[in-house]
Amino acid sequence: MALRIEDKKAIVAEVAEQVSSALSAAVADYRGLTVNEMTSLRKQARESGVYLRVVRNNLARLAIKGTEFECLADALKGPLVLALSKDEPGAAAKLFKNFQKDHNAFEVKNLAMSGELFGPEKLDDFAKLPTREEALATLLNVMQAPVTKFVRTLNEIPSQAVRVFAAVGDSK
């Protein structure tokens, strides 16, 4: 079905808007999936906060032009589904990784983040990226550790003095 020029411009504008606020992107070949499987993937994407769209490659190239995801332009070949992570950088990769476990026909082609293009072998690394909350918790633990150690050291001084006095009292 041919799209009118107005429809194409609307699609490019919508995808460009989503790309401008995305943290990472992933593209996958969806050939061989049934309609029910694609519907399931779309539902999972909505639940995990991932923008998912099947878009023509030329329109996707226009949408990513001038963004940090322009590195994906040469990788857009064949029927692909585009996933954009908006809240956490690993969300699209986690979605694709979990979906790929049960659907052999689904094949991740490329991933992109911060202007760099990655192959499908990096899918596990992307999927393991911590969420914002997990990263902040780790940072707080790292910052808190030296302070906790310092406080324990300060508390140890009076304890040692009490033990010395108790030992002297016991010896007399």
UniProtKB/Swiss-Prot annotation:
Family from the record: Belongs to the universal ribosomal protein uL10 family.
The UniProt subunit note reads as follows: Part of the ribosomal stalk of the 50S ribosomal subunit. The N-terminus interacts with L11 and the large rRNA to form the base of the stalk. The C-terminus forms an elongated spine to which L12 dimers bind in a sequential fashion forming a multimeric L10(L12)X complex.
What is one process in the GO biological process aspect for this record? translation
Q: Any idea which GO molecular function terms this record carries?
A: large ribosomal subunit rRNA binding
* Positions in coiled-coil regions: none
Keyword list (alphabetical) reads: Ribonucleoprotein, Ribosomal protein, RNA-binding, rRNA-binding
Name of the protein described by the UniProt record:
Large ribosomal subunit protein uL10
Q: Which purpose does this protein serve, as stated in its record?
A: Forms part of the ribosomal stalk, playing a central role in the interaction of the ribosome with GTP-bound translation factors.
Where does this protein come from, organism-wise?
Francisella tularensis subsp. tularensis (strain SCHU S4 / Schu 4)
Q: Which GO terms describe its cellular component?
A: ribonucleoprotein complex; ribosome
Question: Gene encoding this polypeptide?
Answer: rplJ
| Record Gene3D superfamilies | 3.30.70.1730, 6.10.250.290
InterPro entries cross-referenced by the UniProt entry: Ribosomal_uL10 (IPR001790), Ribosomal_uL10-like_sf (IPR043141), Ribosomal_uL10_bac (IPR022973), Ribosomal_uL10_bac_type (IPR047865)
